Amino acid sequence: MTKTYLKAALALAVSMTTLVSVAHAQGVRESYAPVTNDMVLNPPAEEWLSWRRTIDNQGFSPLDQINRDTVKNLELAWAWPMADVGLQETAPLMHDGVLFLQTNNNIVQALDAKTGDLIWEFRPALHKVPAEWGYQLYQSRRQKNSIALYEDTVVLTTVDARIVVLGAKDGKVLREVQAFDVEKGYSYTVGPIVVNNTIISAISGCSIAGTAGGCYIAAHDFNTLEEKWRFNTINDPNNPDQQASWGEVPPENRWGGTPWATGSYDPKTNTTFWGIGMPAPYAELVRGSETGDVLYTNSTLALDADTGELKWYYQHLPRDNWDLDSPFERVLVDVEEGGETKNLLISVPGKNGIFFALDRNTGEYLWSQETVVQNVVSRIDEDGTVHLNEELIMTALGEAPMICTSVSGGKLWQAGAYSPLTQQFYVPLTEACNTTEATQSEFTAGNATGAMKFGPRVLPEGITEAGLVDAIKVGVTKSEGEGWKSRQRASMTSSLLATAGGLVIGGDAGRYVKAWDDTTGEVLWQQRLNAPIGGYPMTYELDGDQYLVVPTGFSAAAGSIASAFPEIPIPSGTGNSVFVYRLSKQ
């Protein structure tokens, strides 16, 4: 691909970098050392270098100073209001005493991780789109996942479909490329993986009218930003089965297949794993795919990291008719069983809330387990074939079946965490149902092609609590009766963090950050903050002290089912902040 630099935007972007010249910040900048490739693959225990700390996406920290016994002694070390109002799904990173934050509108801030002092701030000049492009404006202002640290840089994917490389010490733009066409509707809501001098990320906006025919995972050279490969998630000419799965729908009339969450990477096999979202239009009645599975939507893809070649795929929800996308984090774990090590990929990939365990070397289905109330999947065969409840598939306009879970339920973008110490996967979930009704809609620039009307989100019959943390025992085979569930009225609105201190940490729409015992599910500590807990809690150690970082702010998850717990009001405004705790010195 020809490299296209936006020189005018680059000049403006540089002018928007604020560098704070205070003595302490200057010292932190001067001591900052490059993040090597080996560090990305094996990060120091005290640091958090990638979206989920390690690029297997486990979300686990080996730190244990904050533990079951000491968590009650947490106190606030410092707090920081994030740069802009709006939706907040930040994933903080920490290296060499610098805490990096990215919030909406692609603003990146570098803070002293010990004091909370600002070191630098980067505010990009973003491409302007018309106000009537409502869906694109909404999606492009919610940056999921993260930036990435590599060598002496911060790698950023932007809402206007650029890849930008910043200097980690000063936030100045080093290079950038327009990776996809923002005028068609493409945007990045997914942070990158950077490994082996390659930036791997995935584009979003693929259910917007102008993006028909292509949704992509792509790799760029870290040093030159030239494209190395791209993989189309809804049009694979090398796979006749994939083409046939869309029925008579030609590639130019296909939408969807967005990889909404950052993938994982296995260095042993040089494989990157990505989850793929729903098709569009959402109902086959409108999209014209008849009873086809519409590959590779709602699938896990295993790609060669050097070439982008497809190694295998597994489809978790074929023939989606309800916007129950399955793109969320794919987690790589190794488990011992029968004297052998088995390489697994585990995930609760989507909104129907079903847990899957796959052999990550072959894609073989091993087992699955339901977590929340769902009525869409009727059964899964021993070979992994997924069967649907045909009664819920709309066959005429005006039909409005009740679907559980809902478009806002089950597993959403909030990531789970896996502890290798307990061999459990901890998942934040939401119980919810809604009706779905297919519509005939005109597709306009900058707006979605879903063509569906969703009813109010309600709790499933017999369920009185929206929020759920489910601890799932992970093995080669299913373990009946192991693990635990912790239910609560308010929905879960943050990702989870697991630590060697025996804790699982996350929070909810009711503004509570909580620490659960990772073996029993007992809540050991909680504190109410200024706004719903959001983003991705994380932890690091600096100068002998372990710190816990808790982001807060409003996200799409915060209000999606708030009517189910009216006694817990959600504050107006956003309250986008980070609260940083450490153990009391008293």
Task: Describe these PLM feature segments.
Residues 57-179, 498-499:
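N-terminal cofactor/phosphate-binding cores enriched in small/glycine residues
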Residues 334, 429-431, 461-522:
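Loop/turn-rich, solvent-exposed surfaces of beta-rich toroidal or solenoidal domains
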Residues 27-76, 233-240, 388-392, 458-459, ...:
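Blade/loop signatures of beta-propeller domains
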Residues 48-52, 87-107, 135-163, 187-209, ...:
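Repeat-blade elements of multi-bladed beta-propeller folds
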Residues 214-226, 290-309, 358-363, 467-475, ...:
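Beta-propeller blade signature
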Residues 80-93, 121-151, 176-191, 232-262, ...:
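Extracytoplasmic beta-rich repeat domains
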Residues 201-216, 274-294, 400, 431-462, ...:
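Short, conserved, GDST-rich strand-edge loop motifs in beta-rich repeat architectures
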Residues 538-586:
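Blade-level signature of beta-propeller repeat domains, shared across WD40, Kelch, NHL, RCC1
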